[in-house]
């Protein structure tokens, strides 16, 4: 198999002058934006249907997915779907029998304010009567002193006035104590409550009772006045949203489970050192719908009973990260841009050409052929950055060049780090792009999600330290998957090399990988470096590569093909080897595509044919490998 038959220059995916967006418009001003939040959710049709069903049947929902895929938006949308006619106000009353157990009462929305106002008015009326009584006592004493101006009359008068003031003051305090406190006020709400309890501590989530430093002498604050509702109570008849629910302690998750089961939860002081710990109200209604969110790790860290409750009385939904690249879905991205402009309120609308560039970026970030990304928060960041640039330039609309400039200016931290990494390593010749080196290869890796780096890897062969067998020794802060991938490489080497490998120790070093390496996409790079060191054949340094490797010698697909290739371009590398399966995942702009030659491969021998320098040793090596690999029918 010659190099010309292996080499295939990829055709960029629709990176032309125009893109079919499925709708005719000049600017996003013409695009209608739905009023309901549920209609603004893009690409998560399955999740939308579940949310609608859950809202109708009052079921709990667990949303699992990556950040920026619309989990919190779905929670807010659910609150819009809930009815408002069932909303209630919650009041706390003093308990004359036990002041440390205030009474709880629920009334229809808006009646709570009227009840509190009535109690306050009665208290003020009684206050007026007491003032009149005090004035009458003072007037009577003054009259008595005038009629009989003796020392005894004066002293008795002063005593009567002071005693009257003390009695009336105590009566005033008691009347004030009888006024209830409005814990939850839903008056005037046009939609059901939506409470975001992400990261809340115990007092904020479950309710608390404030500490009272004055607990004697009539100076203390009544217990019911110190009761504060928790977020579970504020979400009564609405939605309680908790992102990264696994960050809650197991004790809080257990309390949350109790509240979900009983639909009511008493409020008590959360601190043992506070006087509020002595107060415990009657159970306070908290009939909420829980919308919990998190990533896949969340499932392992959740309280088993809490997850069982959600699964048994609700739904679990996995949020998609991509959607098919269809005309209908492109139309949805146009709507998304219009929504972001309207939601921001400070940036101008986008021209059609600018929206096309956003859609192209969505194609690129999907990382899969025929798909668009659904990590819309990141795309929204580009929309806002482009709008800021257009405002700075004094433009009426955001144009294509503003979007391109925004993508350069608003690079994520990982991309800035990757650019610095490549520049720094090239300056000190850690990354080489010319000539040939034995046992040295330019691998490719990804930092974060969309930032590629060049990863130099070196291998040397030394006589085995053990008489029994040789070892593969790897350094460079590798993760578990990366270590296992290196072990898989040894299977191919043993197969073509035979027993001779037992006489050697093979050392593999990932150069200056202080950030660590994880994943198996460096497998073909390690295999190439080791084989080069064993056979003493130089590797071309103008070639970079990425790909996973099976023990049968097949090159398997990897993630992040496009950012890896872009990193190679920025490093000055001329050729890149990628898995054949990732061929259509590559999405490069025309100016970048012309700077690189891309070689899709299916087997390790195709990798070596491109990466190793020509010579009779290379031809003999390829012959032996093809004879040894089971892919070519060898036993």
From Swiss-Prot:
The keyword Protease applies. Residues 1-131, 174-635 are cytoplasmic. This is Archaeal Lon protease. It comes from Thermococcus kodakarensis (strain ATCC BAA-918 / JCM 12380 / KOD1) (Pyrococcus kodakaraensis (strain KOD1)). ADP inhibits the peptide cleavage activity of LonTk, but the enzyme retains 57% activity in comparison to the condition with the addition of ATP. It is an enzyme of class 3 (hydrolase). Residues 435-614 form the Lon proteolytic domain. The lineage of its organism: Archaea, Methanobacteriati, Methanobacteriota, Thermococci, Thermococcales. Homohexamer. Organized in a ring with a central cavity.
């Amino acid at each position: 198999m010659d190099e010309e038959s292996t080499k295939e220059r990829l055709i960029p995916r629709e990176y032309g002058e125009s893109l079919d967006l499925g709708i005719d418009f000049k600017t996003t001003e013409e695009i209608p934006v739905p009023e309901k939040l549920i209609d603004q959710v893009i690409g998560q049709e399955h999740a939308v249907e579940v949310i609608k069903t859950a809202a109708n049947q009052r079921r709990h929902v667990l949303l699992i997915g990556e950040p920026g895929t619309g989990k919190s938006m779905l929670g807010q949308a659910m609150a819009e779907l809930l009815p408002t006619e069932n909303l209630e106000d919650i009041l706390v009353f003093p308990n004359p029998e036990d002041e440390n157990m205030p009474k709880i009462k629920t009334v229809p929305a808006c009646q709570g304010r009227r009840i509190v106002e009535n109690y306050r008015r009665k208290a003020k009326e009684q206050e007026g009567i007491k003032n009149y009584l005090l004035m009458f006592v003072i007037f009577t004493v003054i009259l008595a002193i005038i009629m009989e101006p003796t020392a005894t009359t004066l002293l008795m008068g002063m005593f009567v006035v002071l005693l009257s003031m003390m009695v009336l003051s105590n009566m005033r305090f008691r009347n004030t104590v009888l006024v209830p406190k409005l814990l939850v006020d839903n008056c005037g709400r046009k939609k059901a409550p939506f409470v975001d309890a992400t990261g809340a501590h115990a007092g904020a989530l479950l309710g608390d009772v404030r500490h009272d430093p004055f607990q004697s002498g009539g100076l203390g604050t009544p217990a019911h006045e110190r009761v504060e509702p928790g977020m579970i109570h504020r979400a009564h008849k609405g939605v309680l949203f908790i992102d990264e629910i696994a960050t809650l302690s197991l004790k809080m998750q257990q309390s949350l489970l109790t509240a979900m089961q009983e639909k009511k939860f008493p409020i008590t002081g959360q601190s043992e050192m506070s006087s509020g710990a002595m107060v415990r109200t009657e159970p306070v209604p908290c009939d909420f719908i829980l919308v919990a969110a998190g990533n896949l790790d969340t499932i392992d860290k959740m309280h088993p009973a809490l997850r069982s409750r959600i699964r048994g009385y609700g739904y679990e939904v996995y949020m998609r990260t991509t959607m098919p690249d269809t005309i209908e879905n492109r139309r949805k991205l146009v709507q998304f841009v219009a929504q972001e402009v309207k939601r921001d309120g400070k940036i101008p609308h986008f021209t059609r050409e600018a929206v096309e560039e956003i859609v192209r970026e969505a194609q690129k970030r999907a990382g899969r052929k025929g798909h668009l990304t659904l990590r819309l928060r990141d795309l929204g960041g580009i929309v806002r950055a482009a709008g800021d640039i257009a405002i700075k330039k004094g433009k009426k609309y955001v144009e294509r060049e503003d979007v391109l400039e925004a993508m350069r200016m608003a690079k994520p931290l990982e991309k800035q780090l990757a650019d610095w990494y490549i520049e720094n390593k090239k300056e000190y010749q850690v990354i080489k792009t010319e000539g040939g080196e034995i046992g040295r290869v330019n691998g490719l890796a990804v930092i974060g999600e969309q930032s590629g780096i060049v990863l130099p890897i070196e291998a040397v062969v030394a006589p085995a330290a053990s008489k029994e067998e040789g070892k593969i020794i790897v350094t460079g802060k590798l993760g578990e998957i990366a270590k296992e991938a290196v072990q898989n490489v040894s299977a191919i080497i043993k197969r073509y090399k035979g027993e001779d490998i037992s006489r050697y120790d093979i050392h593999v070093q990932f150069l200056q990988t202080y950030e660590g390496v994880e994943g198996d996409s460096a497998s073909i790079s390690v295999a190439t470096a080791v084989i080069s060191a064993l056979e003493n054949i130089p590797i071309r340094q103008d070639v970079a590569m990425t790909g996973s490797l099976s023990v049968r010698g097949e090159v398997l697909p990897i993630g992040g093909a496009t950012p890896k290739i872009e990193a190679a371009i920025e490093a000055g590398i001329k050729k890149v080897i990628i898995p054949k399966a990732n061929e259509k995942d590559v999405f490069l702009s025309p100016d970048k595509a012309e700077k690189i030659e891309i070689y899709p491969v299916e087997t390790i021998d195709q990798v070596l044919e491109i990466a190793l320098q020509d010579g009779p040793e290379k031809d003999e090596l390829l012959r032996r490998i093809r004879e040894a690999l089971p892919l070519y029918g060898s036993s």
